[in-house]
Amino acid sequence: MDYSEIMVRHGELSTKGKNRMRFINKLKNNIQDVLAPFPAITVRSDRDRTHVYLNGTDYQPVVEALKLVFGVQALSPVYKLEKSVPLLVTAVQDIMTSLYRDGLTFKIATKRSDHAFELDSRELNSLLGGAVFEVLPNIQAQMKHPDVTLKVEIRDEAAYISYEEIKGAGGLPVGTSGKGMLMLSGGIDSPVAGYLALKRGLDIEVVHFASPPYTSPGALAKAQDLTRRLTRFGGNIQFIEVPFTEIQEEIKNKAPEAYLMTLTRRFMMRITDAIREQRKGLVIVNGESLGQVASQTLESMQAINAVTSTPIIRPVVTMDKLEIIEMAQAIDTFDISIQPFEDCCTIFAPDRPKTNPKLGNAEKYEERFDIDGLVQRAVSGIVVTEITPEIVNDEVENLIDALL
């Protein structure tokens, strides 16, 4: 027997009341996006669960993809068959025979929503359990914590059998909590921040600052590859490349060295906020961790935040670097993040950046710039690319390999 579908159980969606179907429909759309590399698959959702019909597709890579999708509490590969007692008996015997080993314990757990079926749940449990003993006389039944719980569901349209329950990612479906702009540099922290924002249902668009020729095509490809890794958790992501060369050169030429980083981050925040407003986002997300570097002291954050009234979410702000690294390794972004390409935050980094910059000083130094013009030119020059879970070709990876 081959699995016919993966049955997905919803997570926190059960608490969403009148908005429940909106959340479920969004989860369905996200699952369809993530499973786009499997063209034979179809997806259907109802109030209780989502059905991923395999239609001949190997179930294992599908399970691996679904395990990462936020909003999924658990999933089970399922056999679908006609509602016939003889067919159920044969299926249960075949499945348990394939799983059997010495000392294995089991139980049958039947659920019947089709009350017109000839046997009730209790009778089915007894009948199917007896059928297992017929072919495996040495197997042991155990009602609490058995090795195998064989779940049988009798529904209006068919019967379903499963024995695996695989833990999902939990959280909320991406897109159910609004849209935010993720400032992604290419380092270790910002992809982790993006992952945690996605987990709470935030639909992120990635904002990446590029300063050619100071930053290379490899740095851009690296940021896009990190974004692609994040698509596994909720579907396609818009990648927004911002031209930042003019601004960085202006800051380098006109500002004191100690304030280079503060002014750079203030311009980045202004531009991200302008893009957010243009694209109807609600928040800005970044990977700042308190005290980790000079620009992430409270004084620096205050001086940088002053350019916007938009809420700024910092998911990793209280995490140690080792905690962030462990999470980056778990979500498979760490090895990409440590590839040796310069980004906008490092190319003109001063030897002794100001750790307690004064807002008044930052504003005074900015009087030397045409702030509105610089921001407007950067925003008008953005390039937007849709990043999908499916790598259509290997151009990005080949480019990175060639540059390393």
From Swiss-Prot:
NCBIfam families according to UniProt: tRNA uracil 4-sulfurtransferase ThiI
Domain THUMP intervals: 60-165
GO MF term (any one): ATP binding
A Pfam family assignment: ThiI
Originating organism: Streptococcus pyogenes serotype M6 (strain ATCC BAA-946 / MGAS10394)
EC number: 2.8.1.4
Protein name, as recorded: Probable tRNA sulfurtransferase
One GO CC term on file: cytosol
